[in-house]
Regions:
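Short, surface-exposed recognition loops or helix-turn segments adjacent to catalytic cores
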Residues: 52-61, 80, 163-167
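Hydrophobic mid-domain F-helix/FG-region of cytochrome P450s
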Residues: 40-46, 61-69
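Short, hinge-like loop/turn segments at secondary-structure boundaries
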Residues: 71-73, 288-289
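Positively charged, Gly/Ser-enriched RNA/tRNA-binding surfaces
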Residues: 1-50, 99-303
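Short acidic alpha-helix initiation/capping motifs at coil-to-helix transition points
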Residues: 55-58, 86-92, 140
Length: 303
């Protein structure tokens, strides 16, 4: 976890400084990393009671194969993908208009967009591109993507769906393989994403290191939780033990044992020495979420 900065126009859930929660697997070249990362991240979201969200998945090599098949030069890929990334905002017609405005051949643009009209958001869509793109797409790319989708769907513990999305770009050009994003209707966009970046670490260390990562936007998740009045499990069971400062040590041990047992049962227990202004002390604890109070005096225990 750490702070991240970017030049952006602040808006709901989008800030110039934000906290990013990241999980990465280094040294694993196979799709086991992608499967594990997706399952770990979605399990976390499930425990926070998020449901019916979507993991959109694609592969940078599919993006490149679609562009090459359509007749775009490799030097044009970045520009083409930047425009494609706007698909959810400007639609197919908007993408076509911008590609033509960039001066690309109409035949190439038409052939490119026909792929998106015919592909479906499931394993059948992956198979369609595998068959259509032929030699432009290495066979293992499509097979690996299908395996990721199948494996996650078969072993997931949270309530979400996997969707193949050939328009998913993930703006970072350092991605080398599968890429994915978390889409939530209640946010209206992505609350997290990641992918494989096998070449990045080696550029800095000189040592080739396969890598894959997944991150969630901490502020976006917190914002959504607050908007639906999410309560931390056990937060209603916050109890304060307020102890007379003259409490004998033998009786203090009994209180500590009682607190230990309560904590083992899932309660949050705060042990504090009683202050002169007890009302003010309790009021302060109430602001911290404590709803139950037990007061202990020297004569609270017999014997």
């Amino acid at each position: 976890m750490g702070n991240v900065w970017r030049a952006d126009r602040p808006q709901r859930g989008r800030y110039r400084q934000f906290m990013q929660c990241d999980i990465d697997i280094l040294g694993e070249p196979t799709i086991l990393a992608e499967i594990e990362l997706i399952l770990a991240t979605t399990t976390l979201l499930g425990k926070l009671d998020f449901k019916n969200f979507t993991i959109r998945i694609n592969d940078r090599r599919i993006l490149k194969a679609m562009a090459a098949y359509s007749g775009f030069a490799e030097a044009d890929y970045d520009t083409v993908f930047i425009i494609l990334d706007k698909m959810d905002k400007i639609g197919l017609d908007g993408v076509k208009e911008e590609l033509l405005k960039e001066g690309y051949a109409e035949d190439a643009v038409t052939k490119y967009l026909e792929l998106f009209e015919k592909v479906t958001a499931d394993i059948s869509g992956v198979q369609y591109l595998k068959e259509t793109l032929g030699a432009f797409l290495p066979e293992e790319v499509a097979e690996n993507l299908k395996t990721i989708i199948d494996s996650v769907e078969s072993t997931k513990s949270a309530d979400f769906k996997m969707a193949f999305d050939p328009t998913l770009v993930r703006g970072m050009s350092y991605y080398t393989g599968p890429i994915f994003e978390i889409s939530m209707d209640e946010y209206g966009g992505s609350v997290g994403g990641g992918g494989r970046y096998d070449e990045m670490i080696g550029k800095f260390t000189g040592q080739p290191t396969p890598a894959c990562g997944f991150s969630i936007g901490f502020e976006r998740i917190i914002m959504l939780l607050l908007e639906r009045d999410f309560e931390i499990p056990g937060s209603k069971n916050k109890t304060a033990y307020i102890i007379d400062k003259k409490m004998p040590s033998d009786k203090l041990l009994k209180i500590l044992e009682q607190a230990k047992q309560a904590r083992a049962e899932g309660q949050i227990v705060n042990i504090a020495i009683m202050k002169k202004n007890k009302k003010f002390q309790k009021d302060q604890m109430i602001t911290e979420g404590y709803t139950q109070f037990e007061e202990f005096y020297a004569d609270s225990f017999e014997g």
